[in-house]
Amino acid sequence: MNPGVSEQITRKSASNLALAFILLPPEKRVAMSALYAFCRQVDDAADEDSIPVDERRRTLAAWRTDIAAACEGREPSMEVNRELAPHIHTYRLPFALFDELILGVETDLVQTRYNTPSELELYCYRVASVVGLLSIEIFGYTDPACRAYADALGKALQLTNILRDVGNDSLRGRIYLPLSDLERFRVRPEEILRREWSERFHQLALEVDGRARGFYRRAREILPVSERASMVSADLMGNVYWRLLERLGRSRFHVLDETPQRLSRARKIGIILGAILRSRLGLRVTSYGGD
C-alpha cells in the first residue's frame, strides 16, 4: 500500500478545505487528508459526464460497499479507503454519514433541478454538512452543539459554492437555484442556461445569498466558546467562503460566466495567516456571519 495516495489527491486539489488542514496537528492532518481524498474521489465519480450514468451509479455503489467494509472492521479493497480505515476506527466515523454523502452525490446523477429551498437544503446537508459532521469527529469536541454548528456551516459553504458556480453548472444543464425562487423573481430557466444576467437574476441571487448568510450567522452564534480552539480549521473555512460570498455580492452576482470567480491564493494565504495569528493570541478566529 502506498500511504501517500490520499496526500497526493489532496495536494493536487486547489480546494479551500485542503488549505484549512494547515492548522491541524500532524495526526489529524493525515486523517483529514484521507477523509478529503475519499470525498474527492466519490464526487469525481459522480461528476464525470463522459461516463454513462449507469456506470457511474455502479462505481458509487462499489464505493458504498467498500467504505461499509472499512467501517465494519473488514479490509476495504480501494486504496483510499484502506488509508482512511484506521482513522475511521480512531475517530469512530459512522457509516451512516458516509452513506448520506454518497446519497448526495448520487442525486447529481438523476436530478438537475430543485423545486424548493427545503429540497436544496437537503442536498446541501448531504454533500456538505455531512463532510463537516465527519470532520468535527476528527477535530475532536465535547459539546454536542458542535454538530449543529457543522450542519449550519456546511450549508452556508455549499450555498456559496452554488452561487459561485451558476454559470459553470448551467453548461452541464444544471440549475441548483430553487425553481420556486426563479418563478418568484420571474427568471426563466432558459435565461440561466443561456447565461443571461439581468437585474431579476441579481435579485434572485440576493435571495439565496440571504439564506447563505443566515446559515453563516447561525454557525457563528451556535459555536460554543469552549470549542473555538477545536473548530479553528472549520472556522477558517467559513472565513474563506465568507470572503468569497462578499466578492460575489460586490460583483452584483455576475456569476453566469463559464469561469467561476475565486479568491486568489495570496488572498487565501492572508486569511490563513490572520487566523493563525488570532488563534495564537487567544482571539476568536471567526470573521464570518457578521453585519
Residue positions per predicted region:
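Catalytic cores of Mg2+-dependent Asp-rich isoprenoid enzymes
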Residues: 1-158, 163, 167-291
